[in-house]
Swiss-Prot record:
Name the UniProt record assigns to this protein: DNA-directed RNA polymerase subunit omega
EC number from the UniProt entry: 2.7.7.6
Organism of provenance: Frankia alni (strain DSM 45986 / CECT 9034 / ACN14a)
SUPFAM superfamilies in the record: RPB6/omega subunit-like (SSF63562)
Record note on quaternary structure: The RNAP catalytic core consists of 2 alpha, 1 beta, 1 beta' and 1 omega subunit. When a sigma factor is associated with the core the holoenzyme is formed, which can initiate transcription.
Gene name for this UniProt entry: rpoZ
Length: 94
């Protein structure tokens, strides 16, 4: 069966170990990827309306059915995104 080998994308490719190098923990990776996936999803939704508020995928999408989360994970792995860690401390309430 030549030509039927699946090329894994998304959760299995890129490997989780490579993705964890871009963040502090697996929890921040989940939030990081989910926020970017929401931006990509909003970009595709707004295309029909003629609005260009969000930035589209920064990596080439060869499959039209590729999920926004898979695209976000590939962007993180490629080093195309940056994120800032926010301090958890809140100012005292007066």
């Amino acid at each position: 069966m030549a030509g039927t080998v699946a090329h894994p994308e998304g959760i299995t490719n890129p490997p989780i170990d490579e993705l964890l190098e871009a963040t502090d923990s697996k929890y921040s990776l989940v939030i990081y990827a989910a926020k970017r996936a929401r931006q990509i999803n909003a970009y595709y939704s707004q295309l029909g309306e003629g609005l260009l508020e969000y930035v589209g995928p920064l990596v080439e999408t060869t499959n039209a059915q590729e999920k926004p989360l898979s695209i976000a994970l590939r962007e993180i792995n490629a080093g195309l995104l940056t994120h800032e860690t926010v301090s958890d401390s809140l100012p005292p309430v007066a």
